[in-house]
A protein has these predicted regions:
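Alpha-helical bundle segments enriched in helix-capping/polar residues
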Residues: 1-166
Length: 166
């Protein structure tokens, strides 16, 4: 089997590589340098493979969000995947310091700047969110005072109406 990838995204990328092989010698050499880097750093490669195996299929999550068919699970999956990506970046830096090969830097560069998104998801989305948006109880009550107020109205609306009537 030629596909020894650990993620759906990796399988799709491999498929694209096989469907449209590189013809530019510089790009071929860049890919060979990346391969050599991981061959020379097998423990890092194995650590990254294990980490990648725990990630969500971000392409699918983002597609569902764009099609307005996402669930809270998609948002949490993105959050967890960002957390894993940050760990992978830290593994690179621990191994090689801040002076990484330009090809490896090009792999890591898209991961930079994701922490603010992680923070928003971590601060706002409940870990115990239901699978459906229509069920509610997705946003943490302490995320914003208005959310807590609306939640209180949903939960205690009848009793508040009764109090007003009395």
């Amino acid at each position: 089997c030629i596909d020894d990838t650990v993620t759906k995204s990796g399988s799709r990328l491999l498929y694209q590589y096989l469907l449209a092989p590189l013809v530019d010698i510089e790009l071929i050499n860049n890919r060979l340098e990346i391969t050599k880097f991981f061959y020379d750093n097998l423990s890092l490669a194995e650590t990254i493979r294990k980490s990648l195996g725990k990630t969500a299929d971000l392409e699918r999550c983002i597609t569902r969000i764009n099609m307005q068919r996402s669930t809270p699970k998609d948002l949490l999956s993105i959050k967890y995947t960002i957390e894993i990506a940050e760990k992978i970046m830290a593994d690179f830096i621990v191994l090689k310091g801040v002076n990484l090969d330009k090809n490896i830097e090009n792999i890591i560069k898209p991961l930079l700047g994701l922490h603010p998104l992680y923070e928003i998801l971590d601060e706002s989305i409940r870990e115990d969110s239901p699978n459906s948006i229509s069920e509610g109880k997705i946003i943490k009550l302490d995320y914003h005072p208005r959310v807590a107020q609306l939640h209180d109205l949903l939960e205690n609306g009848r009793s508040k109406i009764e109090q007003i009537r009395d």
